[in-house]
UniProtKB/Swiss-Prot annotation:
Annotated GO CC locations: cytoplasm; cytosol; extrinsic component of membrane; membrane; nucleus; plasmodesma
Modification N-acetylalanine, positions: A2
Protein name: Dehydrin ERD10
Molecular functions per Gene Ontology: actin binding; copper ion binding; lipid binding; nickel cation binding; phosphatidylcholine binding; phosphatidylserine binding; protein folding chaperone
Keyword Protease on entry: no
Pfam family, one: Dehydrin
Keywords annotated in UniProt: Acetylation, Phosphoprotein, Repeat, Stress response
Induction of synthesis: By dehydration, cold stress and abscisic acid (ABA). Induction by dehydration occurs after 1 hour and increases to a maximum after 10 hours. Cold stress induction peaks at 1 hour and 5 hours after start of cold exposure.
Modified residues (Phosphoserine): S61
Sequence similarity: Belongs to the plant dehydrin family.
Chain intervals for the UniProt region annotation (2 X 21 AA repeats, Lys-rich): 184-247
Amino acid sequence: MAEEYKNTVPEQETPKVATEESSAPEIKERGMFDFLKKKEEVKPQETTTLASEFEHKTQISEPESFVAKHEEEEHKPTLLEQLHQKHEEEEENKPSLLDKLHRSNSSSSSSSDEEGEDGEKKKKEKKKKIVEGDHVKTVEEENQGVMDRIKEKFPLGEKPGGDDVPVVTTMPAPHSVEDHKPEEEEKKGFMDKIKEKLPGHSKKPEDSQVVNTTPLVETATPIADIPEEKKGFMDKIKEKLPGYHAKTTGEEEKKEKVSD
């Protein structure tokens, strides 16, 4: 019985201790002034684990294309490096002084060869021209000999008449002044005819000057009557005006006395 009791006692005591430990953290969490206490420091192992996990996640989340672009941008040369490379390439491609001299010598030798060929061609052409000139001279001498023979046949070395063709030069005839005179006379005659038809414009003939004086007198009389008619019309208007009648009567009486 005693052994059974011993076995049962520790079984009952052990859960009591566990209950006390489990209740202790619950009381701490429910405390009102726990925020004033210092926070528990995180261990360094935990920080390293968190950082490694974060890096692993970021590496998985980043796409491969973005990583490749980033690496290319890092490896790209700067503007200064590009300019330096271009300058080096230009200097490498530039020919040296020896190359330039070699090229100039080769070009001068080729030009001299061409000049030599041209000189030979010119000499050959000159020879051909000289030969052709001699041939032309011989032909001219033959022609001159034929012409001399023809001249010997004719007296005094005259050429046949068929060789010389007379050249006739025709000059345009100048316009004569006399051609314009009949037109002027015709115009004058026409104007004279018109003037003869008008009264008072008849010409005086050279022989009978006294006979043509009568129409001049006849034409003068109607011309003198025109101002009298005008004066009479004006006098009639003036007579109608008041204060002008007395003056006109006195003037008329004076005119009648003078006429008598």
